[in-house]
Amino acid sequence: MSTTSAQATAVVTGSFLSGAMISLSLMAVPVLLDTTTEPTQLFFQWRRMYHYGHQVLPTMAVATTLLYAYTASKRRRAQKPSWAVFALAGTITVSMIPFTWLCMVPTNNVLFGLEAATRLGEPSGMGIEEAQALLVKWSWLHFTRSLMPLMGAILGSLGETVWN
């Protein structure tokens, strides 16, 4: 694969990744909030949305990062200073994974716990407003995480012009 092709593919996959992620916060979560009247249903729907996102999005982040790493490696071997921009683009893109572990896991665990409890018929102990507030918190964290591959794509697209 040529370096230019790897760079272009990384930018496209990073942009697609960010768009797919942002659509969850900007479209899917608002639909859940507008159409769900019971905490049990809200937790179940969130878990399904999380499940499908988890199937695809982390893998895309790693693949995008590997494409940036390949581009950075080829540029470095060619002694082009722009290699550092591509290395940074990859690092920023994959930083969504440790962000998830450090910032989102507590909220995720609460949501997973509430979904599991209500699935077993136990009361959640919260009304719909509290459940919605928890989902809004998750949505803002997820939106923040979604910006990381976007920042990587912006850097990746400007790589040669930023530092050549």
Swiss-Prot record:
It catalyses: emodin anthrone + O2 = emodin + H2O + H(+). It comes from Paecilomyces divaricatus (Penicillium divaricatum). It is an enzyme of class 1 (oxidoreductase). GO terms for molecular function: monooxygenase activity. The chain crosses the membrane at residues 11-31, 48-70, 85-105. Pfam families: Anthrone_oxy. This is Anthrone oxygenase AgnL2. Belongs to the anthrone oxygenase family. PANTHER family: ANTHRONE OXYGENASE ENCC, ANTHRONE OXYGENASE-RELATED. Its EC number is 1.10.3.-. Anthrone oxygenase; part of the gene cluster that mediates the biosynthesis of agnestins, dihydroxy-xanthone metabolites. The pathway begins with the assembly and cyclization of atrochrysone thioester by the non-reducing polyketide synthase Agnpks1. The atrochrysone carboxyl ACP thioesterase AgnL7 then breaks the thioester bond and releases the atrochrysone carboxylic acid as the first enzyme-free intermediate. The gene is AgnL2. InterPro entries: Anthrone_oxy (IPR013901). Pathway: Secondary metabolite biosynthesis. It is found in: Membrane. Keywords: Membrane, Monooxygenase, Oxidoreductase, Transmembrane, Transmembrane helix. It is a multi-pass membrane protein. GO terms for cellular component: membrane.
